[in-house]
Amino acid sequence: MSEPFMFEKPLGMRDVLPNLHSMQRKLGDRVLQEFRLWGYEQVQTPTLEYYETVGKASAISDKQLFKLIDFHGNTLVLRPDMTAPIARLVSSSMKDIPYPLRLSYCSSLYRALQTEGGRPAEFAQVGVELVGDHTASADGEMLLLLNRALIQAGLDHFQVAVGHIGFLNALFLEIFGTVERAELLRRQLYEKNDVGFKEQVKAFGLSSIDEKKLLKLSRLRGNEAILAEAEQLTESAEGKQAVAELRDLWQGLKEGGLTRYMKLDLSLVLHMSYYTGCIFEVYHDRLPRPLGGGGRYDHLLAKFGRPGPATGFGLRLDLLAEAVGKLEVQPKKRCLLYSRERRQEAYRKATALREKGMQVVLQDVAGVDDIDKMSASYEEIVYLIGKTEEGKR
C-alpha cells in the first residue's frame, strides 16, 4: 500500500465546508425543535460501542463496521446506527423509567466502504425513537412527525412510501415455506429492480397462481385502494393482520390531513433487518436515493434485556441539505478592519453590533496580506484605520 498524499482522506470521509456545515446545523436545529414540540427528549450515546453488544445487535452488516481493539483486548465499533445504541441506553441507564419513552438524537454514524461509490463513510443523522408503544397510533405519530419535521426544515415536494414488512414476510412464507428463496426477492425489491424481480420470480418455476401473486405484489403501490388487493393476495392471519394495521394507519393519516405526501408501497423493503411491522422511506426529486426512513422494530430491545415494542426514523442531514437546496437569506457578513491605534474603538463597535445579534468579524489590518481579496469575502467592510477625526488614538 502506497503512502497517502498529505491532503488525502480515508475512503468515504469528507470535509464539510463552512456554508454547508452552517446549513446542516440549522436544518438539524429546526428538526430537533419540532421533535421537542412533540415531547421528544434528546440523548447522546458514545461514538464507540462494544462489538459484542451494539455491534452484533445492529442491522448493519459486519463488513461495514469500523472495528478497533482497546487496551484490554475488547473489540469496539464506531457507532454504525443509532437504534441499537438507544436500545442499549433504554435497557440500562433508563431501565427504571417506565414506557413509553420518546427520545431524539443528532449524531454522526460510521459505515465502512469497500469502494468509493459516491457514498460517505461518515454522516450526520437526526431522528427519533418511540419505545414501549405497540399501537398503530405510535406508527401514525412517526409519520405525522416525519412530515412536520420535513416541512419545518423547508422541504417541499417530498413523498413518503409506506409499507409493512410483516405482509411481505407472510406472503413469502406462504409461497416458499423457507427464507432462502425469499431473500433473493428481498434483494431485488430493496434495490428497486423491477426487471430483476420479475426474472427471479419466473426462474423459480412456481405455480401460475403463486407467480401471479408475486408479480402483482410488485405493482401494489398507490392509495388505500390497493389494500383490498393486498388482502386478497395473502391467506394467512399474519398477512391479513398486516393489511388491517396499514388500513388503520392510513385512516389516522387521513385524519391528520397528510395523505397527500404519502403513498402505500406493499413491496417496500428497507436496509435494516430488524423491522417487524410498518416501514417507510422518504424520497425527493433532487435526490438519487432516500433521504431517510424508519419503521417498527419490536424485537430489538429484548436483546438488551428489556423487551418492548418500538418505532422510529432517521434523516440524513447531508441529503436533507441537498434536497432543501438553499435556506432563506443568510445573515450579512460584516468585517471591522482596524489598525492598532483604533483597536479599542473597533472592540466597542463590534460588541455593540453583536449585542444586536449581528455577525461581526474583527480583523487587524496588519494580519491581512491582500485587503482587496479579503474584502471580497464580506458584504460590508468598516475601515477603522489611522487616527480618528479628533486626532485621538
From Swiss-Prot:
One example GO MF annotation: transferase activity
GO cellular component: cytoplasm
SUPFAM superfamilies, per the entry: Class II aaRS and biotin synthetases (SSF55681)
Keyword Amino-acid biosynthesis: yes
Pfam families given in the database record: HisZ-like, tRNA-synt_His
Signal peptide positions (record): none
This protein's UniProt keywords: Amino-acid biosynthesis, Cytoplasm, Histidine biosynthesis
Protein's GO biological process: histidyl-tRNA aminoacylation; L-histidine biosynthetic process
Pathway this chain belongs to: Amino-acid biosynthesis; L-histidine biosynthesis; L-histidine from 5-phospho-alpha-D-ribose 1-diphosphate: step 1/9
Localisation: Cytoplasm
Family: Belongs to the class-II aminoacyl-tRNA synthetase family. HisZ subfamily.
Function, as annotated: Required for the first step of histidine biosynthesis. May allow the feedback regulation of ATP phosphoribosyltransferase activity by histidine.
Subunit structure: Heteromultimer composed of HisG and HisZ subunits.
Note: This function is generally fulfilled by the C-terminal part of HisG, which is missing in some bacteria such as this one.
UniProt name for this protein: ATP phosphoribosyltransferase regulatory subunit
Species per Swiss-Prot/TrEMBL record: Shouchella clausii (strain KSM-K16)
Organism lineage string: Bacteria, Bacillati, Bacillota, Bacilli, Bacillales
Gene, per the UniProt record: hisZ
